Amino acid sequence: MKKTIVLAYSGGLDTSAIIPWIKDNYNFDVVAFVADIGQSKKDLYKIKEKAIISGASDCYISDLKDIFVKKYVFPMLKTGAIYEGEYLLGTAIARPLIAKAQVDYAKKINAIGLCHGSTGKGNDQVRFELAYSALAPSLLVIAPWREWKFQSREDLLKYLKTKNIVTNVNKKKIYSRDENIFHVSTEGGILEDPWNPANEDCWFWTKSPLNAPNKPKKISLKIEKGCVVSINNKFFNEFNCLKRLNKIGAKHSIGRIDIVENRLIGMKSRGCYETPGGTIIYKALRSLEQLVFDRECMYWKNKIALQLSSIIYDGKWFTPIRKSLQKSSDILSSSISGKVVVELYKGSVRILQKKSLNSLYSKKYVTFGKDNVYNQIDAKGFIRLFSLSSRIRALKNKK
């Protein structure tokens, strides 16, 4: 009986080529493992058949949609993690869950190893293999992009042709696309030159701002402990909440970014990322934090968010430091409850209204009109003490 490898299978060009390549070079059976994390249903319907045609002995589809949003996406959004000021980590946050589910399935069927289709130039190879190391250090890991002779996706197309395996990718439209319920990314093709403008082929979900509605859209979000629980007074679970906001946001061109980012391994890469629902939630949560957090809480929350963004981007999900920082962030976010009204218009998210029972904002204290709660003379003593070190230094230098 042949030994079995479990491949994290997407149905795309790379993983379709990996199946026959492993059979040719390792003489292992390949079981394709597909994580359903909310990508297009149209793709999922065809994916099992495609895996078998490509040579897989079996294809297992694991429904991870709800757990992905509930245990990964929403907790991350609550932290405020955002990489290099723009990227909401839509691909990075999916990798730990896919790897964990893949490992669990490999153990269940007594497979001897794991395989992924990440390139030797990218971040995902690190993310997958850090998770494998944390969860199943004894299993064999195969990373074909670091072994095979193919140098490009064009080479893969030629290889699949020799195997009589049909793919819907062609040389003119050779983008690498990654999709889940939270985010879709497009890389490669014309995007490899930063001087090339991204055309509409590079955008998969969202309408162009030019074609978005001319009338702004207002939506009301209820937030409890850092999580959106209702949209326009209709309650949804986490998955359906994100799905609904994606639909609304995509129509209004929300969540498009075209960025050059610093990869973990040292090089820069360019991608077009779409995160419509996530962008709306991110903006709403940060807006409510402005009402609720004092200066010190805001400082530490932002610092934790910055650290977590790198930890998640680098694939260090299954580490004590990620768990510790996230727990700290959860404690801070326990007071983030309230209501936010946002306006969506041709790619922009504008906060119109916000309120919270935990708000530290006091109109009585900040009014420019007459008030009876704040004695402005008190500021004199505060400033004198606050400037003490500066005055001592100045007096010393004067000597």
From Swiss-Prot:
Keywords: Amino-acid biosynthesis, Arginine biosynthesis, ATP-binding, Cytoplasm, Ligase, Nucleotide-binding. PROSITE patterns: ARGININOSUCCIN_SYN_1, ARGININOSUCCIN_SYN_2. This is Argininosuccinate synthase. GO terms for biological process: argininosuccinate metabolic process; L-arginine biosynthetic process; urea cycle. NCBIfam families: argG, PRK00509.1. It comes from the Bacteria. Homotetramer. It is found in: Cytoplasm. Its EC number is 6.3.4.5. L-citrulline binds at Y87, N123, R127, S176, S185, E261, Y273. Pathway: Amino-acid biosynthesis; L-arginine biosynthesis; L-arginine from L-ornithine and carbamoyl phosphate: step 2/3. Disulfide bonds: none annotated. ATP binds at A8, Y9, S10, G11, G12, L13, D14, T15, S16, A35, G117. The gene is argG. L-aspartate binds at T119, N123, D124. One of its GO terms (cellular component) is cytoplasm. Its main location: cytoplasm. One of its GO terms (molecular function) is ATP binding. It is an enzyme of class 6 (ligase). Belongs to the argininosuccinate synthase family. Type 1 subfamily. It catalyses: L-citrulline + L-aspartate + ATP = 2-(N(omega)-L-arginino)succinate + AMP + diphosphate + H(+). InterPro entries: Arginosuc_syn_C, Arginosuc_syn_N, Arginosuc_synth, Arginosuc_synth_CS, Arginosuc_synth_type_1_subfam, AS_cat/multimer_dom_body, Rossmann-like_a/b/a_fold.
